[in-house]
Amino acid sequence: MTSPQLEWTLQTLLEQLNEDELKSFKSLLWAFPLEDVLQKTPWSEVEEADGKKLAEILVNTSSENWIRNATVNILEEMNLTELCKMAKAEMMEDGQVQEIDNPELGDAEEDSELAKPGEKEGWRNSMEKQSLVWKNTFWQGDIDNFHDDVTLRNQRFIPFLNPRTPRKLTPYTVVLHGPAGVGKTTLAKKCMLDWTDCNLSPTLRYAFYLSCKELSRMGPCSFAELISKDWPELQDDIPSILAQAQRILFVVDGLDELKVPPGALIQDICGDWEKKKPVPVLLGSLLKRKMLPRAALLVTTRPRALRDLQLLAQQPIYVRVEGFLEEDRRAYFLRHFGDEDQAMRAFELMRSNAALFQLGSAPAVCWIVCTTLKLQMEKGEDPVPTCLTRTGLFLRFLCSRFPQGAQLRGALRTLSLLAAQGLWAQMSVFHREDLERLGVQESDLRLFLDGDILRQDRVSKGCYSFIHLSFQQFLTALFYALEKEEGEDRDGHAWDIGDVQKLLSGEERLKNPDLIQVGHFLFGLANEKRAKELEATFGCRMSPDIKQELLQCKAHLHANKPLSVTDLKEVLGCLYESQEEELAKVVVAPFKEISIHLTNTSEVMHCSFSLKHCQDLQKLSLQVAKGVFLENYMDFELDIEFERCTYLTIPNWARQDLRSLRLWTDFCSLFSSNSNLKFLEVKQSFLSDSSVRILCDHVTRSTCHLQKVEIKNVTPDTAYRDFCLAFIGKKTLTHLTLAGHIEWERTMMLMLCDLLRNHKCNLQYLRLGGHCATPEQWAEFFYVLKANQSLKHLRLSANVLLDEGAMLLYKTMTRPKHFLQMLSLENCRLTEASCKDLAAVLVVSKKLTHLCLAKNPIGDTGVKFLCEGLSYPDCKLQTLVLQQCSITKLGCRYLSEALQEACSLTNLDLSINQIARGLWILCQALENPNCNLKHLRLKTYETNLEIKKLLEEVKEKNPKLTIDCNASGATAPPCCDFFC
């Protein structure tokens, strides 16, 4: 058990870290070999924890020694000298950290195992040759070894290369995961070189590189044959090398590119390295540690293979390789351009496109962007249009590598065919036999090798790959977009390439996620200006049918059902990529109801581009994620003069927010320009004061015809006040919902009251939910209701109203001029004490027909008071919802008596109440001819045959009565379904 002193010390240390430092601490923590209990803890809990909570998690899941070592080593790695000294002084026994001076795995047995004569020299000679080749092929466009620093940042998380990592009895399995092109393979190869570096290790160590791209082409073999294929000179030494497994590092590169049927990696696994097996079986045996269990493993993969890997790897350590972070990209631009102004302008252009900026984490994409924009700037061209879309940038890069009028039509067709065939086959590396099968000559590729579109493997000269996966996707889209020659296979069936409809189908994309971005690029190539640019350079023409094919596919997508949020996001992204207004008009024309979830500024831009053409749109549901707008920032004005004077001098975060607000302004114009838009829902949204004001500005305009508005769970709290202010005097508004767990401020109450008392107010439905108001505020609100003549339906569900507040409302409703017809007080913390005054309302009210008291513990006494009101001849109540109100048998007796007296009640909800035998008493009323009840909702009684039979008899005697017994617990329908 961890000592209280250690827990207190750890908490004190962690609480001194700022937000960024705590985030770094967690990242470094992940690189440590976690103990079993901590390893099973959901990492999301660790990510969300503050310093105090993180300390609690660690002391509850890890041993004292582990906590001491990990804390001191991580603080030292973060260069937090003072905190590190404090940790050593307070936490360490004997004042020492248990560090590992020798980074090797294994134990004393390793040192006693000697290599054969000549084996050591032969292995190191081979590795030195390999090292020279790898070091020359790591990065595209490297500047002053810039990428080495980025790689080293990730390399320190590899535990078997970190001398400070605590010794582990079992060997490590490390998984490097991340998107394509961010440097996973480079990092893995550098780890191999460091593992075998004679300067770092006094004993001989071995490393074997297993490329899954290559292994997919191999037939059955033994494991010894598998690893010796690249080392023929060491073939005789393989048995003695494998006998020293604790000295071996295996790198399994690109697990996601291993083409195997589901489950192939976990079938027929074996531990005999001399036995011939299919390559997937050998890899599965290695990962499951059936084969050479004492070896260290380093696996690289894209995220899509992580789920399968979890079934194979034994207690893996996951290291996310992120490539270039934002600061890396900025530094890269500065080095590439040389001129700071040009570099920062280009960098801001890339950052303005979220999709392009995300791709920029790959060094190759950063190089493409820099190369393209620098050339444009040198020519005096405006680079802004180029960065609007990824298609525009990639097309400009492609055309810039060749002179205009080069007439390379055939060569470009060949290249696009190669890209498409590879993408459909989920293949990124092409061998000579692949080229031969497609009828491609290696000489056909020379131009694109020289233009840095393709790369040739310096080790295997007959292997080719594209500069980046995204560029292969772009060229695949080009395959579909180019006009085909007479007699040419239009859809590529001869090469197992799907047609456009198949490309855009959800089924194919699930099997091959790389196809998704091809659709975006294909829309981008449907642009007329881009078609002319391509024709001017290569002499190629775009197919006149491609735009129509895209329209047909998208029409089919939402022909029979409304689009999901994800599908809509993709459609809008594709339309923006096209930059074709006419195309957007045709695609969005059928939309009448849509739901949007905005997660970044690019999505705001996509929506504003297309939805302004959606003139038949009637309902819009909007959700804005945290981070789209910045909080707690200086309130900058948006006038043009301000931006011209200060744009380059204000902080980056403010500049980014200014851009977000400009795009948001364009998006919000939809509310004042579309006369058919009647319903707006804003829910679970993180807005800012400025973004709320912009939205309200468009809502207040006379050209906005919104009738129904729902604002639910929105921040900041002041947004509710601003919306109330915007709706004052809004004639068209008939339904308003303001829900969310917020504290009412006086100004918001004033705005809401002004809205209700305004002579133009036509509000018929008002819902207030989750508000904490004082009795004085409720009194002010209910006082205003006296003067309002339009409001018919009031829902105060989930408010802290209490009996005191409810009685103030009932007092208002006993006045002869109140107009409320429907009242919901669900979950307002009411008791039987308020029901006597409510009964008086039932007696005198000529308007009230619907009443909901669900989830209030009024009990049988409360029901008694209500039934007294129901029994009066002048009572007009038709629907009464008493779901989950603590009603028992006695309450059923009161209800039965009221129903038999021919009261006006036609709908009654008693679900989620333990009425037990009270049901028999209630059934007496249901069989009485004076009972007017038509719909009764009860708790589920499927398992009670006696009650089931009783209800069937009641239905036979009263065929006009509907009894709903499917309303219990979590499956109970919402009260509002029954109430309206």
UniProtKB/Swiss-Prot annotation:
Q: Where is this region: Disordered?
A: 104-123
**Which family does the similarity line name?**
Belongs to the NLRP family.
Q: Impact of mutating K379N?
A: In HYDM1; uncertain significance
This chain belongs to the protein called: NACHT, LRR and PYD domains-containing protein 7
The task this protein performs is described as:
Inhibits CASP1/caspase-1-dependent IL1B secretion.
> Where are LRR repeat segments found?
614-638, 674-697, 760-784, 788-810, 817-840, 845-868, 874-897, 902-928, 933-957
Question: For this chain's UniProt record, which GO biological process terms are given?
Answer: cellular response to interleukin-1; cellular response to lipopolysaccharide; negative regulation of cytokine production involved in inflammatory response; negative regulation of interleukin-1 beta production; negative regulation of protein processing; regulation of inflammatory response
What triggers expression? By bacterial lipopolysaccharides (LPS) and IL1B/interleukin-1 beta in peripheral blood mononuclear cells.
**Domain NACHT, residue spans:** 172-491
Question: Record's Gene Ontology CC terms?
Answer: cytoplasm
Reported tissue expression:
Expressed in numerous tissues including uterus and ovary, with low levels in heart and brain. Not detected in skeletal muscle.
Which disease does the record tie it to? Hydatidiform mole, recurrent, 1: A disorder characterized by excessive trophoblast development that produces a growing mass of tissue inside the uterus at the beginning of a pregnancy. It leads to abnormal pregnancies with no embryo, and cystic degeneration of the chorionic villi.
SMART domains per UniProt: LRR_RI, PYRIN
Composition bias, Basic and acidic residues: 113-123
Q: Which UniProt keywords apply?
A: ATP-binding, Disease variant, Leucine-rich repeat, Nucleotide-binding, Repeat
Q: What effect on the protein does mutating A481T have, as reported in its record?
A: In HYDM1; uncertain significance
Database matches in Pfam families: LRR_6, NACHT, NLRC4_HD2, NOD2_WH, PYRIN
Q: What does changing K511R do? A: In HYDM1; uncertain significance
What are the binding positions for ATP in this chain? G178, P179, A180, G181, V182, G183, K184, T185
Pyrin domain location: 1-93
Task: Write down the PANTHER family for this protein, in alphabetical order.
Answer: NACHT, LRR AND PYD DOMAINS-CONTAINING PROTEIN 12, NACHT, LRR AND PYD DOMAINS-CONTAINING PROTEIN 7
Q: What does the record note on quaternary structure? A: Directly interacts with CASP1 and IL1B.
Q: Under the GO molecular function aspect, what terms does this record hold?
A: aspartic-type endopeptidase inhibitor activity; ATP binding; caspase binding; identical protein binding; interleukin-1 binding
